[in-house]
Amino acid sequence: MFSEIIKKYDIVTLKDSGFLRGDWFIGSALMAHDYESLKEGIYFYPQETIWTRILDLEYINPYWEIYNQTYNFLLVNKQDSLAMNFLTSLLREIEVISSKTLDFVVITSNEHLIRNLIDRDYYIITKEIPFFIENSKVGNYFKIFVKNGGQFIPIIDCTEFKIQSKKYFEININKFYLKLLDYFLHGEIPEKFKFFGNTSNFNIESLFLEFIDSQENIRVVSLLDCLIQLSSKNIEISGNYKGHTVKKILKKFALYSVITKLDITKVNH
């Protein structure tokens, strides 16, 4: 995926460093690399993260997940015009992948981006979403959705920021968001929900929309998916941060297994 864009823009590919860093989990793709040491250019890297901040959210949506896989692009000290052209190239590529012309909705306060995208017939919502590093505002987020009937499906998160006179433009594309987009467009159910259906003997194929209408169902599937990934790295309960996090996830999984009546004895990962 994105191989033609990577070639066209002479993009440097960085290694996926996994979701572990010592005794901590990597919670955002930006944490995975020393971005301040990168030279001017465009970089691409796939990245796994464990996003523990959302564990205690009271209200969630179908896109809620703890373990994430993302495609990431980072533009360092590139002109706004190149960044905007690059972003629209990515949106066109997503349309090719989806085999459909998509209605994009962009939430941003970037005036250059607004002028650029209005000409391309994208729908713009003007709103500032500040981005902070260590409690200091260094830039802004903006978000891109696909409008599909009455649904708004998140597809890309972007961050623009400056640190020590260097300008960064980060683009995150969550693989799970693409899979849910594929479901809403073509009916293909994401793999982690299929696995849950097989594990719990639930006919998820015919009841998927009803299933994801329940926050409890979404929680238990994503908790299970995260535990499977942690198990693959042999991460267990212990006295450090990672071990405490595993314990917390296990307790929540047990709780929502009871609520959703999942027989956890059938889970063999």
What are these model-predicted stretches?
Residues 1-78, 119-173, 191:
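Class II aminoacyl-tRNA synthetase-like tRNA-binding/catalytic domains
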Residues 44, 48, 65-69, 85, ...:
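Non-catalytic, well-ordered alpha-helical scaffold segments
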Residues 68, 168-200:
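Active/ligand-binding-proximal structured segments within catalytic/core domains
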Residues 81-125:
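Conserved, charged catalytic cores of large soluble enzymes
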Residues 100-102, 237-245, 256-269:
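Extended, well-ordered alpha-helical scaffold/bundle regions in very large, multi-domain proteins
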Residues 159-162, 220-223, 228-233, 243, ...:
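Non-transmembrane, aqueous-exposed alpha-helical and coiled segments at domain scale
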Residues 167-172, 216-219, 236-245:
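Structural motif
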Residues 203-237:
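A structural-propensity feature for long, helix-poor, extended segments
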